[in-house]
Amino acid sequence: MTYKVIDIEGVGEVYAEKLIAAGIKTDAELLEKCAKPAGRKALETETGISGKLILKWANHCDLYRINGVGPQFAELLEAAGVDTVKELKHRVAENLQKKLEEVNAVKNLTNRVPAVVEVQKMIDQAKELPAKMEY
């Protein structure tokens, strides 16, 4: 699923306008431009948006490549210590699902946490996808 930049968690209208002015309208375009450090730095220079924020959004866009991961769930994954597809593929479903439950109980980021079988499907898909983010 493709998301408009305004739909990326934490972007908001002001940042969305800056990203659109820089030619980035979707999550896929943000990931493409910001997968490498040089791209993130160039976008930071062009828009004045903090490199830290750009990296966070790019990491979320990386996670959106997984079926079932959208803006809120990407936020939950990040809060549970999973920033990227590359990180997700190394996780154990039972442990990650438990951590997601614990984090969501405190931060209330999503309406529901996926069951272990759903988390396993996400991990399996992550194993099939190429790594995009570089640091």
Feature-to-residue mapping (PLM):
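C-terminal extensions
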Residues: 1-135
